[in-house]
């Protein structure tokens, strides 16, 4: 019989926690707004633009931010807002579309920017025309990122002009009596030089934030929530060996002790030596009760001949839970399945206002007939926050700073059909890459690095013979939260050493390429 997903007590409903909610209008940057607010020690998360005033009252936020978005406020299908929210007495900051929505709903005027002749995309110089608490401590002229196709031409009654730009006569406005603020630019992106200062001013000066949100708070609350949800029942956790599932394991162990059973599924798609490392690290050092299952043949048989990346993810997600079903049937009274789903996983799998980037192994890969209720203790956290949580839980750096590894494992680092030969090329080349990055002292500077079998064969020469072997790609990126990333500028001598070692030590490889694509437009993983 199918069971529903467990909805863990949401942090945003806890009245003793200050929070600022971000209403989602579909901007590619909206998750960064919540991330920036959290950096200040204030809890923040995205909520649907369809949220009602009663639901906002229940959350009791100290502030509301209306995100940007691609739509026009005057379109028939425009995303709106429950106008009773304006009567709650809560400070509101409208960003880009959010400013236009405030204007439109409160009696101002918004028109297509082409009609007003002030369409703006890219960096622009903002000019302050009045003193404002929102802009306190920032210069009269400052560089901001504009990205709007519509424009405010008349501000609502009660508002006054705060700033403009060459092409935007109303770039910022405010109604200090109601504590409503609107800005036409994006403060959440790094291209807006004083963006953090502006968001800090909103959070602290206008909303009255104390900045007392921390991982210690999160640990205490999550342990309490887990105990309340689980009671005296049992939880099954799938360990992958990655940071996320390891942190979930230690958190659950602290919360419910021996009510937790961990299953480590060796699906035949792990990195070199990973299986033994998981058992030694989490079973030995942390005392987790771990059942190791060798299911490699089951997975590889199902993946034979499959080259579509989403099908790979679905197959692995389905089989992963089926293995759990098989193992759980040997145990008594297991009701819950725990996962290391992160906030970024949920965002990348799409919201009602944004397109799905790709199905995620922790979100879209679960079968409809899943036989467990689902617990996701990390699903409000970004990657760097998970590392901070691991440190707060007393986990050593070698665990906390371990390279991120996707649930589908090496399956999504092999383009096309998965074969034993391709698996071996990725395992061995990845081990060399990790070893050389560590030797160069770059393992804490580079956020993530791995190798990919591109599925492409090319002509080469080794010794006196012609070869026709695989091309291996190196992917190395720098990032803060995983939502955006730049390719890592690794020293040429390090790249050269890695390349020489791989082509000499790994069979069936004769060419190495370096991926110099940022995110966006690419994702971190190749599939």
From Swiss-Prot:
Pathway membership: Purine metabolism; GMP biosynthesis; GMP from XMP (L-Gln route): step 1/1
Q: Which PANTHER family match?
A: GMP SYNTHASE [GLUTAMINE-HYDROLYZING], GMP SYNTHASE-RELATED
Q: Name one Pfam family in it.
A: NAD_synthase
User: Which terms in the GO cellular component ontology are assigned?
Assistant: cytosol
Which GO MF term does the entry hold, naming one? Answer: GMP synthase activity
Enumerate the CDD domains for this protein. Answer: GATase1_GMP_Synthase, GMP_synthase_C
Stored InterPro entries:
Class_I_gatase-like, GATASE, GMP_synth_C, GMP_synth_GATase, GMP_synthase, GMPS_ATP_PPase_dom, NAD/GMP_synthase, Rossmann-like_a/b/a_fold
- According to the entry, every stretch annotated as the GMPS ATP-PPase domain falls at 213-402
* Keyword terms: ATP-binding, Glutamine amidotransferase, GMP biosynthesis, Ligase, Nucleotide-binding, Purine biosynthesis
> What name does the UniProt record give this protein?
GMP synthase [glutamine-hydrolyzing]
According to its UniProt record, the EC number is 6.3.5.2
Q: Where does ATP bind?
A: 240-246
The record ties this protein, via NCBIfam families, to: guaA_Cterm (TIGR00884), guaA_Nterm (TIGR00888), PRK00074.1 (NF000848)
Give the reaction(s) catalysed. XMP + L-glutamine + ATP + H2O = GMP + L-glutamate + AMP + diphosphate + 2 H(+)
Residues annotated as signal peptide: none
Q: Which residues does the Swiss-Prot or TrEMBL record annotate as the active site?
A: 96 (nucleophile), 186, 188
Q: What does this protein do?
A: Catalyzes the synthesis of GMP from XMP.
Please give the superkingdom of this protein's source.
Bacteria
């Amino acid at each position: 019989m199918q069971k529903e997903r467990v909805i863990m007590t949401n942090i945003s409903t806890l009245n003793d926690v200050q929070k600022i909610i971000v209403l989602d209008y579909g901007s590619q940057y909206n998750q960064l707004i919540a991330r920036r607010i959290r950096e200040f020690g204030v809890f923040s998360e995205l909520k649907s633009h369809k949220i009602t005033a009663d639901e906002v009252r229940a959350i009791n936020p100290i502030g509301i931010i209306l995100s940007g978005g691609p739509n026009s406020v005057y379109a028939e299908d425009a995303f709106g807002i429950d106008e009773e929210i304006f009567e709650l007495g809560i400070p509101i900051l409208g960003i880009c579309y959010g400013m236009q929505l405030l204007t439109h709903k409160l009696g101002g005027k918004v028109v297509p920017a082409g009609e007003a002749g002030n369409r703006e995309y890219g960096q622009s110089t903002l000019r302050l025309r009045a003193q404002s608490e929102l802009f306190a401590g920032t210069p009269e002229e400052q560089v901001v990122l504009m990205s709007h196709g519509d424009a405010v031409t008349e501000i609502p009654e009660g508002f006054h002009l705060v700033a403009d730009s060459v092409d935007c006569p109303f770039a910022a406005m405010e109604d200090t009596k109601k504590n409503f603020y609107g800005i036409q630019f994006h403060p959440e992106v790094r291209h807006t030089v004083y963006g953090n200062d502006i968001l800090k001013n909103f959070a602290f000066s206008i909303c009255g934030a104390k900045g007392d949100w921390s991982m210690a708070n999160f640990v205490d609350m999550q342990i309490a929530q887990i105990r309340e949800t689980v009671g005296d029942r049992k939880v099954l956790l799938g360990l992958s060996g990655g940071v996320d599932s390891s942190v979930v394991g230690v958190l659950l162990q602290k919360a419910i002790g021996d009510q937790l059973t961990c299953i480590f599924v060796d699906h035949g798609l792990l990195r070199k030596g990973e299986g033994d490392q998981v058992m030694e690290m989490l079973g030995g050092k942390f005392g987790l009760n771990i059942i190791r299952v060798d299911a490699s043949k089951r997975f590889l048989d199902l993946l034979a001949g499959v080259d579509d990346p989403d099908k790979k993810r679905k197959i692995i997600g389905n089989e992963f839970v089926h293995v759990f079903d098989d193992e759980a049937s040997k145990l008594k009274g297991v009701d819950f399945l725990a996962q290391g789903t992160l906030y970024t996983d949920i965002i990348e799998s799409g919201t009602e206002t944004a397109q799905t980037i790709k199905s995620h192994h922790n979100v879209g890969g679960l079968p409809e007939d899943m036989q467990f209720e689902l617990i996701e203790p990390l699903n409000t956290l970004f990657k760097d926050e998970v590392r901070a949580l691991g440190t707060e839980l007393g986990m050593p750096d070698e665990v906390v700073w371990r390279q991120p590894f996707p649930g589908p494992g090496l399956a999504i680092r092999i383009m096309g059909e998965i074969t034993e030969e391709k698996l071996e090329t990725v395992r061995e080349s990845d081990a060399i890459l990790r070893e050389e990055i560590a030797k160069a002292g770059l393992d804490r500077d580079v956020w993530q690095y791995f190798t990919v079998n591109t599925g492409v064969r090319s002509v080469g020469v080794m010794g006196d013979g012609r070869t026709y072997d695989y091309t291996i790609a190196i992917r190395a990126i720098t990032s803060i939260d995983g939502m955006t990333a730049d390719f890592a500028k690794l020293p040429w001598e390090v790249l050269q050493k890695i390349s020489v070692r791989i082509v000499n030590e790994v069979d069936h490889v004769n060419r190495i390429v370096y991926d110099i694509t940022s995110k966006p437009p690419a994702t971190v993983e190749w599939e």
